[in-house]
Amino acid sequence: MQELGITGQGSVRVTRKEGNVVVLEKDLATEQMVLAMGPQHPSTHGVLKLECFTDGEVVTHAEPYLGYLHRCFEKHCEVVDYPGIVPYTDRMDYLAGMNSEWAYCLAVEKLLDLELPRRVEFIRVIVSELNRIASHLVAIGTYAIDLGAFTPFLFCFRDREHILSLLEWASGARMLYNYIWIGGLAYDVPADFNKRVKEFVDYFRPKAVELYQLLTENEIFVKRTKGIGIMPADVAINYGWSGPMLRGSGVQWDLRRNDPYSVYPELDFKVPIPDGKFSDVGDCLSRHLVRALEMDESLSIIEQCIDKMPGSEGFNPRAAVPKRVRAKAGEVYCRAENPRGELGFYIQSDGKSTKPLRCKARSSCFVNLSAMKDLSKGQLIPDLVAIIGSIDIVLGEVDR
């Protein structure tokens, strides 16, 4: 009986078995092909083009081509007042606008040496953790549909709708919130907001377990993701990975724990990493598991914030909001833990203008995507879909 084997070295090997001995019959030479994947439609993972260099069905490497969604974010920042930049940050990672706003405001507040009311800090954590869960639901749902599973996608978007309703109730928008302002918030949360958030936490906790089991107990999903796109921890660190990507490689690094900001030092939560029992540490399945387990930790954080939050009596969400931002001369870099990793802002001020001299965003999506060449090496073409989905990129943040 003849068997075909792809060597990945420019040939297809034809063998036959004689008893327990494998006999080589011949090597069939193959030519390198260059295949273009994309640019995909923005409704998928974004306008990304991958140029795949293949040897038969094996990918020798894949190179991402970026820039299709470039909107001159950093140049816009040089001609817009500090508060006016907040809506632009919403449009970077548009699936996690609250988190992006917060990262930028943290940087400006550090430059201004502002001290915020504790109620503002707790509200910021609640809305950002809600947005983190919503973002992970999109990541998990679209990842499932990438691999051919439609039902989990519907479940994820059903539960995400509850979060969007809560965020709309607080901010007035389902996406692109412009809610977290420099020095405070646009508005205080409604009177029954905490009660409805608690109801959502009680509702979603069993749903998160159900969603976890729906995919991790699916044999096809596990076979499509386990052992695929493995990234060793040392290589991930050298690339500058962060967030679920780095934790999926077994590195327990989370800015909320390792370089805490706001009230996170007062909160008790775990940083999930794969143990290697169910997945191969660093593979696509590990990255999925981290996101799935993180949602439960976010629920715990939200509950603690509701219990510890000061009352609203006499509270003004704009009490520390400066009427006109004119930062002192200097520079600052501040980073925050976004759903896709560390989002950092470097801001330079000349001390005279109400606009930053320079505003540079450090995008975790861009850094994570830069490892595509290593992730794709030696993989089959269908496995590229699993690898891209596991990165969970948002091209609005990659291209800016």
Curated annotation (Swiss-Prot):
Recorded topology in the membrane: Peripheral membrane protein
Cite the EC number.
7.1.1.-
Which reactions fall under this protein's catalytic activity? a quinone + NADH + 5 H(+)(in) = a quinol + NAD(+) + 4 H(+)(out)
User: One GO molecular function term?
Assistant: quinone binding
Q: Which keywords fit this entry according to its UniProt record?
A: Cell inner membrane, Cell membrane, Membrane, NAD, Quinone, Translocase, Transport
Keyword Cell membrane attached: yes
Q: Give the UniProt subcellular location, in the record's own words.
A: Cell inner membrane
Q: Which GO terms describe its cellular component?
A: plasma membrane
| Predominant localisation class | membrane
**Gene3D superfamilies annotated for this entry?**
Cytochrome-c3 Hydrogenase, chain B (1.10.645.10)
Q: Which Pfam families match?
A: Complex1_49kDa (PF00346)
InterPro entries recorded:
NADH_Q_OxRdtase_suD, NDH1_su_D/H, NiFe-Hase_large
- UniProt-listed PANTHER family: NADH DEHYDROGENASE [UBIQUINONE] IRON-SULFUR PROTEIN 2, MITOCHONDRIAL (PTHR11993:SF10), NADH-UBIQUINONE OXIDOREDUCTASE 49 KDA SUBUNIT (PTHR11993)
What this chain does, per the record? Answer: NDH-1 shuttles electrons from NADH, via FMN and iron-sulfur (Fe-S) centers, to quinones in the respiratory chain. The immediate electron acceptor for the enzyme in this species is believed to be a menaquinone. Couples the redox reaction to proton translocation (for every two electrons transferred, four hydrogen ions are translocated across the cytoplasmic membrane), and thus conserves the redox energy in a proton gradient.
Similarity-based family: Belongs to the complex I 49 kDa subunit family.
Q: Can you state the subunit structure given in the record?
A: NDH-1 is composed of 14 different subunits. Subunits NuoB, C, D, E, F, and G constitute the peripheral sector of the complex.
Q: What name does UniProt use for this protein?
A: NADH-quinone oxidoreductase subunit D
Which taxonomic lineage does the organism of this UniProt entry have? Answer: Bacteria, Pseudomonadati, Chlorobiota, Chlorobiia, Chlorobiales
The gene from which this protein is expressed is: nuoD
